[in-house]
Amino acid sequence: MALLYEGKAKRIFSTDNEGQLRVEYKDEVTAGNGAKKDKMEGKGRLNNQITSIIFEYLAHHGIASHFIKQLSETEQLVEEVKIIPLEVVVRNIATGSITKRLGFNKGYEFEAPLVEFFYKNDDLNDPLITDDHVKLLKIASESEIETLKTMAKDINKVLVQLMDEMDLRLVDFKVEFGKTSDGKILLADEISPDTCRIWDKYSDTNFDKDVYRNDTGSLIDTYTTFLNKLEELK
């Protein structure tokens, strides 16, 4: 099976089944668009297991993704999609870049979830773009933009409730979507502490990659604790 693509966190391989791919999660962690990089044994296993559980949970709540099944500790079988070059970010609580861009205090709770689009382009450092930019760049049509926003908000609603049951708060997260050969839009990539900001409901302790970004704790211990909380709900 041929290696089709290798990114910061995953490798994508072909399979013997047409329209299906094998995803391997790597033991690498990056921050700052790759400026900070380390290898951590067990990280790929944790993110694969977390994403598999969350995608199955979302499927039970009517949200379709490319996920088919978990193959091994570090591998998934997924439906082949053409990735839409957007990071769709949903924010419930202000932190990170939006506090610098718009002056919100860290911890400010938005009245309604805020959806933002970032253009997936490493050379441009993944800039924030508007709906009009998305159409101008021919990334998605107006109706597809509305579909992306609706799906992102639906995912947020389900995940906020899930995190609440784990005594956690979903601060923000980013997701990616892809299109099948017949044009259907599916949730793709992953949902894990790599792609979310998650705070303890009572102490605001991080349960996400910010422990690595800010050198405030062990990423492996943090992700393991998160996975244990997730498995307790199964």
Curated annotation (Swiss-Prot):
Top-level taxon: Bacteria
Key words of the record: ATP-binding, Ligase, Nucleotide-binding, Purine biosynthesis
GO BP terms, alphabetized: 'de novo' IMP biosynthetic process; cobalamin biosynthetic process
Catalytic activity: 5-amino-1-(5-phospho-D-ribosyl)imidazole-4-carboxylate + L-aspartate + ATP = (2S)-2-[5-amino-1-(5-phospho-beta-D-ribosyl)imidazole-4-carboxamido]succinate + ADP + phosphate + 2 H(+)
Keyword match Ligase: yes
One Pfam family of this chain: SAICAR_synt
Matches recorded under CDD domains: SAICAR_synt_PurC (cd01415)
GO molecular function: ATP binding; phosphoribosylaminoimidazolesuccinocarboxamide synthase activity
UniProt-listed Enzyme Commission number(s): 6.3.2.6
Similarity comment text for this entry: Belongs to the SAICAR synthetase family.
UniProt-recorded name of the protein: Phosphoribosylaminoimidazole-succinocarboxamide synthase
Taxonomic source organism: Staphylococcus haemolyticus (strain JCSC1435)
Name of encoding gene: purC
